[in-house]
Amino acid sequence: MNQTTFPEQSRKMTDVEAEAYFNKMLTQIKEFNPNEIVAVARSGFSYAMWAAQELKLPLGAYWAERAELVIGSDPERIVFIDDNILSGTTYKATKMFMTRYYPNCEWRWAVLFSDWHTPEDVRNEIIQGVRLPYFAMEPMWGSRKISIDYGVRYRDE
């Protein structure tokens, strides 16, 4: 999507904002009490790894375009994590996928942020750090790579 199609130009989310949104999202995930975190390929991997490490939970992976879910042994409660949600297309496809293949698994969808394009019915069903009135380019948080110590990356890793 071209940036000019948005009501206002995108702006880069600051590290402080991203940290606050991530923590809000993580608090809601904790309240759901999952037994596994699932990274939505590709953009959800960083956030999902951080959440899994913080919560000391196993990490699975999901490729929506090919309907492939890699998880541990039949978890009861999982949270899919992606970076953002716009129209909700991937989320809606995942709802159908989970109903068909994992009908006994309770699950939630979590994102760092949604924006004004995200339909209200989708926003009401998901975990989100924040709803933004613009399209944000989230920071890379380059120094926050998964490591022995949260937020620290050692040269030999």
For the regions a language model picked out, list residue spans one by one:
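Active-site-facing substrate-recognition patch
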Residues: 1-31
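A structural signal for isolated positions on well-ordered beta-strands in alpha/beta enzyme cores
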Residues: 36, 60, 79, 108-111
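PRPP-dependent phosphoribosyltransferase catalytic core
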Residues: 2-8, 96-157
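Glycine-rich phosphate-binding loop signature in dinucleotide/nucleotide-binding domains
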Residues: 29-33, 73-74, 102-103
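Short glycine-rich phosphate-binding loop at a beta-alpha junction
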Residues: 32-43
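Short, glycine/charge-rich flexible loops or terminal/linker lids adjacent to PRPP-binding catalytic cores
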Residues: 48-82, 86-96
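Short beta-strand/turn micro-motifs composed of small residues
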Residues: 39-41, 82-85, 111-114
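Conserved P-loop NTPase mechanochemical-coupling segment
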Residues: 6-7, 41, 51-55
